């Protein structure tokens, strides 16, 4: 989303303007192109439907949501990259980050793309083209990434814009209850995820994520894991698997590696619950429509 402020000069001033530029020796210089980068997705869409994820304060400064960003301004007519910059240290306490481009920038139509990392302090990783953001480099979880892309028309009347960063990934929360006493590690595997996102906010490719969670004795009663994940590839379903291991790295006997199909979406929380009982009993539930529904095998009951 972008907001444009248009300034209309009096007729006498308008006659002094050429079709493409200001006559700088007769009037004040044309204002430079300026863009305020704001955060649109401060919370997950469904964060208020569960108490397993704490909502974020909606009134923080920009640095309360974003730790680093990269912006790119590209000229549509020529395809040239006019400016690209990485920003890691924000000094302002404002609720937006302002980009002021050089006042010698020619009037024209541009595309502004901003990739950003949330408060995860993870580096932004791009593919070999340097354009597309890798969402799960080396099958890792990666950071809490944001993106905005907008077309900006820059002329004597249109030069002040606002754009909003939107969260690229969702989050999978897995609640594990009554874990076996010899459980030391919970291995997570998620297959069927998008691999990268383009500057046009189009998801492409396929990837998988592997993650290990150390489990202490105090966690056996109940432990919660959270994993940042790209949406399910093709708009379909991803497959989540959980495997429990002991201190020696051996997989524990019993139905601990049951797989579940889940639909992962950007800026949404997906909740699973693994409840272990005596005799190797395992009940898997998926949180749907404000309540837990038991999952049998790969289907919801």
For the regions a language model picked out, list residue spans one by one.
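Bacterial N-terminal signal peptides that target proteins for export
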Residues: 1-9
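C-terminal motif of bacterial Sec signal peptides marking the signal peptidase cleavage site
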Residues: 18-21
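Acidic/polar, low-complexity intrinsically disordered N-terminal segments immediately downstream
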Residues: 24-109, 121, 266-301
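Solvent-exposed loop and beta-edge segments used for protein-protein assembly and interaction
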Residues: 29-31, 63-65, 104-108, 155-157, ...
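Tryptophan-paired
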Residues: 65-123, 184-264, 296-301
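Structured interaction patches on ligand/partner-binding surfaces of diverse proteins
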Residues: 91, 119-160, 248-280
